[in-house]
């Protein structure tokens, strides 16, 4: 059976439309209620059965790496008392997260090209770092529905969603 096992999430943009807050925090870490967008995107990938994620980050986005770092002594102490930290540990057990730096912003095509070694000739899902689809925990929504199509007929699919203004 054909399954998508990898996802690429480019988040290397500068977030200029969200200035001044994005001077200090990456756009993908901006919260929706109490959870950053990047966490929702990884949860969506896990619900779709994806096991590996590559997050493409820009030169000043170490905060994205730090968000998912559960190894520091400080985080270890926090995880004893706060379920939220334990949840990130659990998420990391469900999907292997790796990172690559896009040193110069040359657009989406260049960002995806940085995933060449990660993809290693496998087909993969691409979730844009600012393309949030609320799924209510349904695995057949968003990227999950595209993965289901792929399982039945391995081809290339594009998901779109109307954004009312």
Give the positions of each predicted feature.
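A glycine- and small-aliphatic-rich helix-loop capping segment at beta-alpha/alpha-beta transitions
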Residues: 24, 28, 71-75, 142-146
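Conserved beta-strand scaffold positions in the cores of enzyme catalytic domains, especially
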Residues: 29, 97-99, 156-158
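A generic structural signal for alpha->beta connector loops
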Residues: 26, 94-96, 153
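Conserved core of the sugar-phosphate nucleotidyltransferase
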Residues: 134-165
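A generic "binding-loop/recognition-motif" signal
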Residues: 14, 25, 60
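Conserved N-terminal catalytic core of the sugar/cofactor nucleotidyltransferase
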Residues: 2-9, 17, 35-126, 133-138
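Short catalytic helix/loop segments, enriched in acidic residues and glycine
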Residues: 24-39
